[in-house]
Amino acid sequence: MEKNLTTGSVFGNIVRFSLPYLFSYFLQTLYGMADLFIIGQYADASGTTAVSVGSQVMHMLTLMIVGLAMGATVTIGQAVGARDQKSAARYTGNTMSLFLVLSVAVTGLLLALVRPIAAVMSTPAEAVSGTVAYLRICFLGVPLITEYNIIASVFRGLGDSKRPMYFIAVACAVNIALDYLFIGALHMGPAGAALGTTLAQAVSVAVSLAVMRSARGGIALTRDDFRPQRAIMGRILRIGVPIALQDGLIQIAFLFITVIANRRGLTDAAAVGIVEKIISFLFLVPSSMLSTVSALGAQCIGAGKSRRALQTLWYAIAVAFGFGVLISVVIQFVAEPVVALFTHDAAVVAAGGPYLRGYILDCCFAGVHFCFSGYFCAIGRSELSFVHNITAVVLVRVPGAYLTSRYFPATLLPMGLATAAGSLLSVIICVIAFLVLRRHGKLLPGEG
């Protein structure tokens, strides 16, 4: 189960680690789309809206859990790189204990706030009951979502990105089968979609726990490893909390941008919604690079091979930026046909094309700052990732979207460029932070 990523070809390790991670992200996207697709076949518009709104809430929550789990990936990765099995076991056990308590507490809070959450999301009156039913069941499954992501973070910290891919594949297959049972055969509507999702997570967690217990070459856990230790939990949270807050606030920012688009009318709102889905799919590559740099970089830092960690960063930036440039050039010629894959409305296609042409440049800049974020996490400075992302959101993304929407009512192109400009600011901040760290000798704590 444990894989040493501190030797061999740096580029080869990046490819071998990132491809399963990339496919995992793809499966998670498919997982989320399955509920909407299937309920759209069997329910009315209110049922589809309920699942759509509920899915947005759960997506935001899941991203925050994944961000928080980054602390486990990095700390375990550093321990593995240092060949310190005892520390790796303690970080693993404390992570599981910490997140078990947090998930139960969060579940209780969310269940108490389910109706206010539906109201904050501006859920249409016809879909409120379905949204509440969907969220209640999904909230009961929060401990399962947390458990899956923690187990996945442990495996990735050990250098294994394949097994988490298998676990999400199991969940995806079970979810689709249960959706057809609960929504199609039993006509349970949004509640059926939520029940299918929750039970699929339960199956995935059961499989992942069985694999973790039987896998050879993994971490041997004892009862003492699960005993809370303030220093260990503090280090996990110091890395994970900034990422979780960052991901949550970014999702809130995107909700603001959605509101801004909605005020432009139905056509522009539909165009923005479609382009957001296209971009989220294309961003799978930068996202996989972030996770790859954090996991591989953490092992290299733990092994005292800081120069190799830097090589991992540069190779990942080359891959992510190269992908961004390629896809940006292609989209300039095929923007409208790509948007047309999701709608037959000519007006929506005409509005979405320019927006996609501007927004796609974000793939270039985001690919760079995602890699820097992964590196900052690997060296235990995740607060830098938080700072550059939130600064870009507050100073450029949201105000830029508002101002361009107001002063350019005839086209969405400037609104798309404003989003890319936010990522450009993030790149500038990342480069400055990197140079400052290098000047103060904070990038090379060890040599190898």
Predicted regions and their residues:
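Residue-level signal for short hydrophobic patches within transmembrane helices
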Residues: 7, 11-30, 34, 57-64, ...
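Transmembrane helical elements of multi-pass membrane transporters/channels
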Residues: 16-35, 137, 171, 200-204, ...
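Transmembrane alpha-helix boundary and packing residues in multipass membrane permease domains
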Residues: 21, 25, 37, 74, ...
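Helix-terminus/linker motif at the lipid-water interface of multi-pass membrane proteins
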Residues: 30-49, 118-125, 181-188, 248-281, ...
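Small-residue-rich hydrophobic transmembrane alpha-helices
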Residues: 48-108, 145-164, 271-335, 366-385
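Short runs within selected transmembrane alpha-helices of multi-pass transporters and secretion channels
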Residues: 138-156, 164-172, 193-208, 287-290, ...
